[in-house]
C-alpha cells in the first residue's frame, strides 16, 4: 500500500481500474516505457534469453519498434492497409497490446497487458505526459510496481527493504502531480447518473517505419 505523497498515484490507479475494468493498473511516466516494461516482463516470465520476434504494424508511433529492440527483441513489420491505424493492436506473439489510441469504459481484455497513453494533444485523457498498464496478473503487477520505481516500494527509501521481492528497476514512476490531474479529469468520462461514458477509438496517420534504416539492425 502506498504511503505519503505516493498515495495519489495509487488513487489514480484505482480510478483507472474502475473505469477500464482492469483488476490491476500500474501508472508510469509514458506509454513507451509501459510497453518496454511489459516486454521485459514477458522475457523474464518466459525465460527468453535469445532474440525474440515481435510483430509491429509498419505504420505506428516510432517508439514501438524502439521498445521491442530495447527489450532484446527483433521487429517484424506487418503490412497496414492505408496510412492510418485505429485503436489498439496486439504485439503478437505476446499478450501485450499497444492501446495508445484507445481509452474507454470496460476496455480491458482479460489475460492481457494493455498499455494506454495520456501523452499528446489527441488522447481522450490528456495529462501532458503519462501512461498506464492494465492487467489481471498479480505476480506481474507486483513486479511492474517495483520495476517502474527503481526497485522501490511506494514509501520512503530510508524505510524500504530492497531485498523483499527484489527487482532491478527503472525510473519510470508517474509523478504525483500528473496523477492528481488525472484524478480530476477522469471524472469527465462519467454521466451525471454515474454511468461511464464510452469513447470512440482514435485513428491517426503514421509514417511507414519499414522504409527507414534506423530499425534495420533490430528487424527480422
Segments from the language model and where they lie:
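Conserved N-terminal alpha-helix of the aminotransferase class I/II PLP-enzyme fold
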Residues: 1-33, 197-220
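PLP-dependent aminotransferase-like
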Residues: 40-107
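Active-site region of PLP-dependent enzymes
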Residues: 103-105, 109, 113-220
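Short, acidic/glycine-rich phosphate-metal binding loop used to engage nucleotide
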Residues: 22, 31-32, 79-82, 120-122
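Short alpha-helical
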Residues: 33, 62-63, 139
Amino acid at each position: 500500500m502506498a504511503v505519503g505523497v505516493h498515495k495519489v498515484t495509487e488513487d489514480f490507479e484505482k480510478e483507472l481500474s474502475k473505469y477500464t475494468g482492469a483488476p490491476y493498473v500500474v501508472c508510469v511516466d509514458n506509454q513507451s516505457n509501459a510497453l518496454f516494461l511489459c516486454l521485459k516482463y514477458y522475457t523474464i516470465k518466459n525465460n527468453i534469453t535469445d532474440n525474440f520476434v515481435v510483430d509491429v504494424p509498419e505504420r505506428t508511433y516510432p517508439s514501438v519498434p524502439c521498445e521491442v529492440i530495447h527489450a532484446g527483441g527483433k521487429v517484424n513489420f506487418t503490412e497496414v492497409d492505408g496510412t492510418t491505424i485505429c485503436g489498439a493492436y496486439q504485439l503478437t506473439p505476446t499478450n501485450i497490446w499497444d492501446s495508445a489510441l484507445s481509452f474507454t469504459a470496460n476496455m480491458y481484455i482479460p489475460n492481457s497487458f494493455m498499455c494506454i497513453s495520456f501523452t499528446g494533444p489527441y488522447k481522450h485523457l490528456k495529462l501532458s505526459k503519462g501512461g498506464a498498464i492494465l492487467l489481471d496478473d498479480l505476480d506481474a503487477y507486483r513486479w511492474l510496481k517495483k520495476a517502474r520505481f527503481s526497485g522501490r516500494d511506494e514509501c520512503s527509501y530510508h524505510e524500504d527493504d530492497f531485498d523483499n521481492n527484489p527487482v532491478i528497476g527503472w525510473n519510470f514512476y508517474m509523478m504525483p502531480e500528473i496523477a492528481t490531474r488525472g484524478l480530476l479529469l477522469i471524472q469527465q468520462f462519467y454521466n451525471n447518473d454515474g454511468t461511464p461514458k464510452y469513447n470512440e477509438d482514435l485513428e491517426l496517420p503514421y509514417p511507414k517505419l519499414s522504409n527507414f534504416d534506423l530499425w534495420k539492425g533490430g528487424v527480422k
